[in-house]
Amino acid sequence: DEAILNTNKKLIKKGDVHTHPVWRSVECAISSTRRIVKIAERYKKKAHILHITTKEEIDFLSQHKGNITFEITPQHLTLFAPDCYNKLGTYAQMNPPLRDKSHYDRLWYAVRNNLNDTIGSDHAPHLKVNKDKEYPNSPSGMPGVQTLIPVMLNHVNDGKLTLNQLINLVCENPVKIFGIKNKGYIKEGFDADFTI
C-alpha cells in the first residue's frame, strides 16, 4: 500500500534496519492483501498472492480461499525479528520484511494446516558491496532459488513439515494453480525435471 509506505517513511531511522518492518508495517501488508482479494472477488478472477508475512494476512486469506491462493517464502519460515536484524543487519532486509516471532509462528501454523498453497523463493540477490550500505540505502532482498530446497529440507528434517507437504508446495500446487502442463510430477509423459 503506497499511501501507508509514504506515511510511514518518516519512521525510518537511518542506520537502523530494525525500523524496516515499522516502515513496511503489518497494516501496509494487510491493506494490500485485502485490496487484491477485493478486486479478484469483484471481477470473479483468480489471484495468487506472493510473500505473505503476517498473521493478519494468514487469518484473512484462510477465510477467502477458492479463487485466492497464496505463497510464503523460506526466509520468512526461517528468520524472525529482532534476532535476524541483530545477527545479520541489512543482510536480513527484504520486502516484505522479516517480522516478529508471532508472525513467524502463524506462518508455520499455515504450513502445518495446509492453508498456504505454495512456497516461493522471492529470489532477489544483491552484491555484498550494496548490502553493506547503511540502512535505508541498502537494497532489500536475498538469494532464494538456490537456497529454497536446502532450507526447506532442513525444516523437513526438523519435523516442521513432511516431505510430501514440501513436494505439494513447491512442485504440485504451482503447476495446478498456473495450469502448467507436463510439470510438477514424476509421471509417464511428464517432463523429467529433477532436483538431486
How would you label these PLM feature ranges?
Residues 1-119:
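Histidine/acidic residue-rich metal-binding segments in metalloenzymes
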Residues 18-44, 113-119, 124-195:
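His/Asp/Glu-enriched, well-ordered alpha-helical/loop segment
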